[in-house]
Amino acid sequence: MHVTLVEINVKEDKVEQFVEVFRANHQGSLLEPGNLRFDVLQDESIPTRFYIYEAYVDEAAVAAHKKTPHYLRCVEELEGLMTGPRKKTTFIGLMP
């Protein structure tokens, strides 16, 4: 299992727009054959900070995800909403 945790910091006045933009990516990702989990989390103490927890069966499924229309559209639309670049950390899932 290949897991990625993505931190996204959003401009204060763009939080609602971020949620709407990311909703389409979330829904599309859940339908991908290699997807095991795709959670969108909002930090309780910093409401402009979001974490995306993505679990895929393997790296090939992750690569396929990054070529999907919903992912590409989301990445493009996020550019004007973020305060800086996304921060990604990858993991090997041992025990789901």
UniProtKB/Swiss-Prot annotation:
One Pfam family matching this protein: ABM
Tagged with keyword Isomerase: yes
Residue stretches making up the ABM domain: 2-91
Keywords: Cytoplasm, Isomerase
EC number, UniProt record: 5.3.1.32
Localization terms from the record: Cytoplasm
Domain of life: Bacteria
Disulphide connectivity of cysteines: none
Protein's UniProt keywords contain Isomerase: yes
Catalytic activity field: (2S)-2-hydroxy-3,4-dioxopentyl phosphate = 3-hydroxy-2,4-dioxopentyl phosphate
InterPro entries for this protein: ABM_dom (IPR007138), AI-2_Isomerase_LsrG (IPR050744), Dimeric_a/b-barrel (IPR011008), LsrG (IPR033672)
Subunit structure, as described in the record: Homodimer.
Family stated for the protein in its record: Belongs to the LsrG family.
Protein name: (4S)-4-hydroxy-5-phosphonooxypentane-2,3-dione isomerase
